[in-house]
Amino acid sequence: MTRSVDIKNREREILGLIIDSYIEESKPISSAYICQKYHLACSTATIRNIMVLLEKQGFLSHLYTSSGRVPTQEGFRCYVENCDRQNDSQEYSISLDSYASSQPSIEDVISHTLDALVQLSGYTSLMAVSGRDEKIFFRGMRFMLEQPEFEDVRRLKDIFYTLEVKMGALQNLFFDSIDDGIRILIGDDIGFEEIADCSLVISGLRDKDLSFAFALLGPMRMNYNKATSSLQSVRNRLKETVEEFI
């Protein structure tokens, strides 16, 4: 159960700015950085005091090798669930015109959906389709290599282990999440120890006897606005395709 509902408006605002900066910079964020970047009408001491409060509430962690702070899992949950995020309502333009040339197979749908998700989001894309045993299709693992969180090759091994050995359980998680619209799972919420330092953003749709579930996997420091907008755009385009051809 998250405690983020107790956070005050000013603290929520500063937490959002800290996490926005951390997503962009991938390094501890200081009070001076926040004041300078966002031209806030308050002193660095005021921001520092708020950061101390956020740390006491469990939303930030202080790295003693740095004067800055980084978000905790609880901080990211608050950011996603309660912070006033800028609503990115713009739908990304998706070209899936290859569907229109002829009736696509399920394999075509899977391939083009994964390609579109990778292209739009820049994150590793996963997909499951009902009736395809317990298989998880994925694309874009190279994007994991670009994230500093996964410089340790052992972390990538853990991810591959989950995708290959725990496909059935992962597929169940995907299909259970379809009716939620877009579901964001952060860290331990995913339920798999091997990827407990990641985030998973899931969407999908059901049509007649078929269920399509797709997701984006990345570090907790992922761009959630971009991830959710990418999934929504792909879901809308896939829905049109399914209704017309499948």
Located regions from the model:
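Alpha-helical promoter-recognition and RNA polymerase-docking modules of transcription initiation factors
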Residues: T2-V5, Y38-L40, Q232, E244
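Intrinsically disordered, acidic Ser/Thr/Pro-rich low-complexity regulatory segments
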Residues: R77, D84-I246
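Contiguous, well-ordered alpha-helical segments that form the cores/surfaces of helical PPI scaffolds
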Residues: L15-D20, S199-I202
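Short alpha-helical segments that sit at the start of domains
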Residues: M1-G16
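N-terminal helix-turn-helix
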Residues: L17-D20, E24, P28-N82
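Conserved phosphate/pyrophosphate-binding and hydrolysis machinery centered on Walker-type P-loop NTPases
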Residues: S4, K8, P28, R69, ...
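A short glycine/serine-rich beta->alpha loop
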Residues: T2-R3, L60-T65, R221
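Conserved RecA-like P-loop NTPase ATPase core
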Residues: I14, T72, L216
